[in-house]
Amino acid sequence: MFYSFCKVGQYMTYFKFELIHRSKKSRARVGRIHTPHGIIDTPNFVAVGTNGTVKALNNTMLHDIGLQLMFCNTYHMMLQPGTDIVRQAGGLHSFIQRKLPIITDSGGFQVFSLAYGSVADELKSRGTKKQGGCVLKITEEGVLFRSYRDGSKVLLTPESSIKAQKDLGADIIIPFDELPPYHIARDALKKSLDRTHRWEKRSLEAHLKNPQEQAMYAVVHGGIDPDLRKESCAILTELPFDGFAVGGSMGKTKDEMHTLLSLTLPLLPEDKPNHLLGIGDLPSIERSVPLGIDTFDSSYPTRAARHGILLTKQGPLNITKSEYATNFNSIEKGCLCPACHHFSLAYIHHLFKARELTCMSLATVHNLYFMVQLMEKYRKQIQEDLI
Amino acid sequence: MFYSFCKVGQYMTYFKFELIHRSKKSRARVGRIHTPHGIIDTPNFVAVGTNGTVKALNNTMLHDIGLQLMFCNTYHMMLQPGTDIVRQAGGLHSFIQRKLPIITDSGGFQVFSLAYGSVADELKSRGTKKQGGCVLKITEEGVLFRSYRDGSKVLLTPESSIKAQKDLGADIIIPFDELPPYHIARDALKKSLDRTHRWEKRSLEAHLKNPQEQAMYAVVHGGIDPDLRKESCAILTELPFDGFAVGGSMGKTKDEMHTLLSLTLPLLPEDKPNHLLGIGDLPSIERSVPLGIDTFDSSYPTRAARHGILLTKQGPLNITKSEYATNFNSIEKGCLCPACHHFSLAYIHHLFKARELTCMSLATVHNLYFMVQLMEKYRKQIQEDLI
């Protein structure tokens, strides 16, 4: 069992990573992340609850299906309701009534992706400035942007991001970083990376002044440049972070991502947990678990659910197809989720056709339970050295 | 205890109305309606689940809060998924997985309200033909209308409505009736009433050929004309219906409705349950319980919930108001609903502001639980002769 450092020589008791098994077949590993709000078995899937709820569910439902880690977005919580209010409520766990672990990001990703658009937007030339939010100025200090909610100017810096994340009080927090656009010259990428490292260091320093029983994961950047990725690992692993997230652009294809992760993961310390930011579609998880990724967050299963895509062991099915109108079986035989336990494909198909909100929660709870089960299966297979 | 007749001399064992207490102070009464899917304590509120679900909830949640009767709309179920499919699923209870009693209407109300608009639409001159559905022809046979879903022509007759309701298999069904517009000359109203009586009789005959453990409530019509209301009661109470619903236009104001109900209720048999169709706002319930109404259906509490109106003992509150942003109490102190048990006003306010679907289900489950509790309070007060 490895204990993470808070400061040199000072053992943390509230956060540790326990390595249970390392596969003989790959770099895949099974572990346990101990947090103030309980254990996260790894590898695991992290549900995205941007505004403090997974869309269409409530947090007691998440608890009941055993979803161990939930991702909330600091950017959104800053703008609504404001992190002050969450602090007054006693922190995010109390405000949203979640008893299990939470991770928050720095807000940087959202600010920059609103400015540049997502990588996918960029590749598809869908333009920028979604939702009307925009970056006004990037300086060494931080980023000045306009709130998409009320048009007010907001300055986000490493210190203000950490202040916000202290208000939120998640178990795992993320330093402030820059998300450079996918199409960027190497010089500009290098400059961005250097600044990100300075911002992450400032974030860590701000955090360590008041650890508040939170753990901080660094975010490895460097885009699709292998040398810069290596440099990022080298610099960040020198700092007393509690874990390491992999962020930034990872290329256009799953092959590119696989290559980058294969290069990056071995450069991260084995005794600390790692996280793959914003990627959690099924093929990516399948290819990344053998590389040693511990946790994945993604809105894929929940967003897919709201569009009628239900995950099953036989692959995703589109519940809106007419073939399900008279299928009175459950989504997946043997599935113990509340949707499968009570309702048929035909009924859920009907709810989608009738545009009833109820279908969203049934589909979402099924897909998340599927992810919980899938990750449990991966852990079992790793322990049996099958992965 | 009164037993309803199925045919003369043939006692029904699957449906009966049990009168528990008649108030000494008013015509209010406490009773129990026994159905194949359990008891409905009266007076009670009936939740509207148009498409086989209360919007934003699932049927296990309804069960858990003790909602004893749910109203599904035959018109909607005919067009989507089609009552054939529901029959194949084993009926509505099986299809939507509801273990407690269900009532369905005839489809007539929707067909005509799509043609004429609702009374409220009419009074506000909002015009007709909402959603693009329209009545093509009304004959003695029935109504030919165009489906708002696919533009196909559908003929709804007393016999086809009952056929559909046999497919659905609710505990309580409603004969096919005409909903005349509010602004109608007396002659036309009288003609409509006569036809409605013929249609209701045909519906009853169709039903009694195959009772299928269903009970049928007549629908008293006559609009705002006291003499026609009396005539309707006289004619319908001669027929072996199992209960009596009051339908049609009941005037522009609550006073008009009160006058009409005061006149109508004493003309209905005491040994059978009655129902007030489509009216269940709080002031109307408060004024109608003393008149002896047993059940009320209304989409008010659920629709209000989706607009952020939460019902409390101190009156409705608008959760979207900024005063709730930092109110960390539950919606109502002591309320045992899932929303109050877990979440604060501030969090639900936040979910509304962030436009999260989750707020809809929390608000809806609270409002319905409020109605369950309210009706229980009324029953208690009647038993103590306070109403």
From Swiss-Prot, chains A, B:
Functionally, this protein is described as follows: Catalyzes the base-exchange of a guanine (G) residue with the queuine precursor 7-aminomethyl-7-deazaguanine (PreQ1) at position 34 (anticodon wobble position) in tRNAs with GU(N) anticodons (tRNA-Asp, -Asn, -His and -Tyr). Catalysis occurs through a double-displacement mechanism. The nucleophile active site attacks the C1' of nucleotide 34 to detach the guanine base from the RNA, forming a covalent enzyme-RNA intermediate. The proton acceptor active site deprotonates the incoming PreQ1, allowing a nucleophilic attack on the C1' of the ribose to form the product.
Q: Which organism is it from?
A: Protochlamydia amoebophila (strain UWE25)
Q: Which GO terms describe its molecular function?
A: metal ion binding; tRNA-guanosine(34) queuine transglycosylase activity
Write out the GO biological process terms. Answer: queuosine biosynthetic process; tRNA-guanine transglycosylation
Q: Where is the active site?
A: 105 (proton acceptor), 297 (nucleophile)
Which residues participate in substrate binding? 105-109, 177, 248
Cofactor needs: Zn(2+)
Could you identify this protein by its name? Queuine tRNA-ribosyltransferase
Q: Does the keyword Glycosyltransferase apply?
A: yes
Q: In which pathway does it act?
A: tRNA modification; tRNA-queuosine biosynthesis
Q: Which Pfam families match?
A: TGT
Q: How is the cofactor bound?
A: Binds 1 zinc ion per subunit.
Q: Which gene encodes it?
A: tgt
InterPro entries given for it? TGT (IPR004803), TGT-like_sf (IPR036511), tRNA_ribo_trans-like (IPR002616)
Identify the stretch annotated as signal peptide in this record: none
Q: Taxonomic lineage of this organism?
A: Bacteria, Pseudomonadati, Chlamydiota, Chlamydiia, Parachlamydiales
The EC code for this enzyme is 2.4.2.29
The keyword Transcription is annotated on this UniProt entry: no
Q: Which family does it belong to?
A: Belongs to the queuine tRNA-ribosyltransferase family.
Q: How does it assemble?
A: Homodimer. Within each dimer, one monomer is responsible for RNA recognition and catalysis, while the other monomer binds to the replacement base PreQ1.
Q: What class of enzyme is it?
A: transferase
Positions that bind Zn(2+) = 335, 337, 340, 366
Q: Where is this region: RNA binding?
A: 278-284, 302-306
Q: Which reaction does it catalyse?
A: 7-aminomethyl-7-carbaguanine + guanosine(34) in tRNA = 7-aminomethyl-7-carbaguanosine(34) in tRNA + guanine
For this protein, the record's PANTHER family field holds: PTHR43468, TRNA-GUANOSINE(34) QUEUINE TRANSGLYCOSYLASE
